[in-house]
A protein has these predicted regions:
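N-terminal accessory regions of S-adenosyl-L-methionine
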Residues: 2-133, 302-303
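Conserved class I S-adenosyl-L-methionine
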Residues: 155-165
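Conserved SAM-binding loop of SAM-dependent methyltransferases across substrates and taxa
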Residues: 166-178
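S-adenosyl-L-methionine
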Residues: 196-215
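A short SAM/SAH-binding and catalytic strip from SAM-dependent methyltransferases
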Residues: 220-233
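A short, conserved alpha-helix within the catalytic core of class I
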Residues: 230-242
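Conserved beta-strand signature within the Rossmann-like core of class I S-adenosyl-L-methionine
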Residues: 246-257
């Protein structure tokens, strides 16, 4: 078994070397130095039923530790257990995001600045034309440019994000644009970590302190692989109080729950959200993934291949 793992590892390394050259070996060494695992003595007692991440004890433990312990905070993105939930965009998918970014033309200095952020020690890979960057940052940047192409300037908009991770999408949006409000909607532990992360990169969001209270309306709602990963009860609350009160929307829908939890599937979602349409997710990160949008200007300028 051990020999087989070594053989598989060597085959993978050879494939990477043929595709990306010597830099791929250096990347793996450096990422191998960064990666770490949670001590078995650290266990959270907190559980949030109704979502994949909220019910994962190891993930919630890392979130809580990163928010309260600055040493953990400085490296939480490279934690093995955390990467099972977030920060798991691989090298090849990162290249696809970069290809899509390049199709949008010359990237602004602030977008490039964001892509190169190394805060909290994510895995990074070498890409031609941009250097060693986190593939997750490339994804957030590509989604930002999608949103800008679909909806125009985000300046002055009241934005709500459902499922905020550690604040990667909020980071680039508030770095490059100036929303009048950015509502973070997630479990309390995640919102606390997100606010700490955004503060660490010099961003002060105009938001409120309660992720359970909602404004009368929003100009844009965003959800990347999150709305589709929660139970119907929570979905109905968000649908009623956020989505149906938002003029525009960008929701990446996945099928990770399948039949594990009763939830609103994508066809029901578009039937209930006026003006919503399904377009192809680029790059496609899951065979049944869909991108749902509404309130958009046009999809003519959107990268679609």
């Amino acid at each position: 078994m051990y020999l087989k793992r070594i053989q598989n590892r060597l085959r993978k390394q050879l494939k990477l070397y043929k595709t990306y050259g010597f830099a791929s070996l250096i990347d793996d060494i450096l990422n191998g130095i960064r990666v770490w695992s949670l001590d078995a003595n650290h266990k959270t007692t907190t559980i949030h039923e109704g979502s994949i991440s909220g019910a994962d004890k190891a993930y919630l433990t890392i979130v809580e530790l990163a928010e309260t312990d600055n040493q953990i905070f400085q490296k939480f993105k490279s934690n093995r257990q955390y990467r099972e939930i977030l920060e798991h965009v691989d090298r090849d998918t990162g290249q696809k995001y970069l290809d899509a970014l390049n199709e949008y033309g010359n990237l602004s200095p602030k977008v490039v600045e964001f892509c190169k952020f190394d805060q909290c020690k994510p895995f990074r890979y070498s890409y031609y034309g941009i250097g060693r960057v986190s593939p997750s940052n490339l994804r957030y940047a590509k989604i930002y440019l999608d949103i800008q192409m679909l909806f125009g300037s985000l300046n002055g908009m009241r934005i709500a994000e459902i499922g905020v991770g550690y604040g990667g999408q909020a980071h680039i949006i508030n770095l490059v644009s100036k929303p009048s409000l950015y509502k973070l909607i997630d479990i309390p532990e995640v919102v606390k970590l997100t606010l700490k992360y955004l503060d660490s990169v010099g961003l002060k969001l105009i938001t409120d302190d309660n992720s359970e209270s909602f404004s009368d309306n929003y100009d844009l709602v965003i959800s990347n692989y999150a709305f589709s990963e929660i139970s119907r009860e929570i979905q109905e609350n968000y649908l009623r109080n956020i989505i149906l009160k938002s003029k525009r929307g960008y929701v990446i829908y996945n099928d990770i729950l399948q039949n594990q939890v009763e939830s609103i599937k994508v066809q029901e979602f578009i039937a209930r959200v006026p003006g919503s349409v399904i377009i192809k997710e680029i790059p496609l990160t899951g065979s049944k993934n869909n991108l749902v949008i509404w309130g958009h200007q046009s999809i003519n300028g959107l990268v679609q291949s």
